[in-house]
């Protein structure tokens, strides 16, 4: 904070997870927070809202959960074994909500649907993947009714917000 006062630093941010994020937000010193969030990792949903309401910028990481069930073989995502994520996706019948979207587009647009989000970090493996991500982002958030239904199904499957 001394460096900010001296004009050497314009913005101060933190990348974090629960439970520390509540305290970090309450400190009132951060301009931006980077938080993991996706359809399959919703425990930070309320923290995003809290931080946004406090005027803190929100950067989401992991908004497509590092891929979709097809990509999860033998991987762990923020401490969640791939079997858990696959079970949530399948139990929630999220494929039924795709309506022509790819799973990646659905995940990205779900993430973009959170009203507190300012930006998201999305990885890419190829020029085609980058093009698909840009196209999905341009299409914007999912319709509210699709987000609500996805959340309802995911909650019933055990993937809940905090």
Q: Which stretches of residues belong to each language-model region?
A:
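Glycine/proline-rich, positively charged
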Residues: 1-39, 46, 56, 113
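Structured C-terminal cap/extension of enzyme domains
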Residues: 27-32, 45-162
């Amino acid at each position: 904070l001394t460096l900010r006062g001296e004009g050497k630093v314009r913005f101060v941010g933190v990348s974090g997870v629960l439970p520390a994020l509540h305290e970090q937000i309450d400190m009132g010193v951060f301009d931006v927070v980077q938080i993991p969030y996706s359809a399959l990792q919703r425990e930070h949903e309320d923290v995003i809202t809290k931080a946004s309401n406090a005027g803190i910028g929100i950067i989401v990481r992991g908004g497509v959960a590092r891929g979709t069930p097809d990509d999860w073989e033998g991987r762990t995502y923020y401490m969640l074994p791939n079997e858990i994520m696959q079970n949530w996706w399948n139990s929630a019948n999220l494929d039924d909500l795709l309506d022509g979207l790819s799973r990646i587009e659905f995940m990205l647009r779900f993430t973009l649907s959170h009203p507190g989000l300012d930006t998201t970090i999305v990885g890419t493996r190829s020029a085609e993947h980058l093009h698909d991500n840009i196209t999905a982002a341009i299409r914007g958030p999912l319709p509210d009714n699709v987000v609500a239904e996805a959340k309802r199904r995911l909650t019933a499957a055990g993937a809940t917000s905090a």
